[in-house]
């Protein structure tokens, strides 16, 4: 056996050649000698390893290599490991080259006992299946590694393709030139510039391009008003819209302020337009012209008393201001130039340019006074300038502190303002004196200490009826023992405009005249005067500066819009209870009334020319039978139900309905 395993063929050439020869008989083929083939394979591997060690040895004797062949115990462990990995499906491309099961299939499948000539096919099938899995994984590993290399070569070729083509053309065209060296691929072409690029997801990359577009498209798919563009765009500076998600409002505002410069605009070209507007103001100031007749029908008692006087009345009291202002006015020859050009007509205010001269302004207002009713100006004697704005602000809000408006727990208590309670003298005399009610004194409780000893003391150490009562709650709600955070909120913000923080909406105090009761306003504060009377507050020493009429109507800090016209409530008589009416019976009753004999001729001039086959709806309702079965009572049948039934009859029997000019009757013509 040892001689057959020797790797040197020179010692025993005869024995080796005799074993390698094929059988000489061409007719009979014996069984294949597996043992001989294994011995030959082992000898060849040993010789090859020995030759390899001799060639690569450098000045020293080759080391004694261990026998690469596994013994029986190692082969058994390899078989068990491969079968376990195959059953658990853990054979992959990483460990497939470490499993040498394919090289030892013969040793595993061979017959263990010499006396047993049968082969274990179950063991052979499991071994073959594990070998197939190992081989397939090796094929996949070779395929993937090869394509990785090809992919790297292709990518490098695309990057440097243009450079190589130019270099090749230069070599072919140029003579006696050296071959250009090939460029090396830079490792930076295969590396990412930052770690964020490696961690980012495809979903985030898609939104990083244009997040506003993705958000808008997602909301648009939902339907409704959420997908509208203005609902998704940001707004800054009042009404400026941010169309780009990368825009910064601060930079846009700063750039816009650089271009904004105060320039003087010449408004002389609108002189004729303003004159025409003033002339046509009476024609266009009515929203619903059809309601003019209804308003004129109101009684004089229902109309509000006028607090104004006519512009045509030349009164010296209208422009007499004696409330601390020393403003002087010029003669009447200057027209309306000095005291302001604004006027108030029926609760509407308008302005005229002050650049119009005195001679140009007079004919405009005189024509307007001749064509329409005289305009009205509010009585300036009934109003006063702003007084003690701080007192009005804090007292009206129920706050007593003016510094920080923070007084601990008392800060949340609302205190009523002390307003002047004015009662007429007649009511004070007629009302009887109120009787003072005395409070009953409560009896002081007496403590009986002897009675407490007679009572049985509870057993505090007794076990509880329910043991769960001794358990503490798992989570307790935190106790609110701290005062709220002081936001330092200023009460002035309540009366400031949101878009115009410098403008404060304040009322004006009204000075009461002696001997007159204030029937025009229910409280001590009334709304602003006409927009033109700015001279009243020129010398005011209040906390606010004079605006000198440099703002528009919408930004005036000294005036408010006048109170709208109030109309008394009109009681409308309508049914307040539900009624049951049989419409079919009502239609039959109306049709029977229409088919009766012709009605007598009407002496009224409006119905004198009616044809004989016509009926009056008013007369029809007057002659309605009392025994109608359409409702329990005849009063339950209303005219509008009869009119609805009449419309049905007109469609069914081809009737024609004609109304009257006064809208108080309806004529029915039979077909």
Curated annotation (Swiss-Prot):
It is found in: Cytoplasm; Chromosome. It comes from the Eukaryota. Residues 1-33, 404-444, 510-564 are annotated as: Disordered. Residues 536-556 have a biased composition (Acidic residues). GO terms for cellular component: condensed chromosome; condensin complex; cytoplasm. Mostly expressed in flower buds and flowers, and, to a lower extent, in roots, stems, leaves and seedlings. GO terms for biological process: cell division; mitotic chromosome condensation. Regulatory subunit of the condensin complex, a complex required for conversion of interphase chromatin into mitotic-like condense chromosomes. The condensin complex probably introduces positive supercoils into relaxed DNA in the presence of type I topoisomerases and converts nicked DNA into positive knotted forms in the presence of type II topoisomerases. Essential protein. Belongs to the CND2 (condensin subunit 2) family. This is Condensin complex subunit 2. It comes from Arabidopsis thaliana.
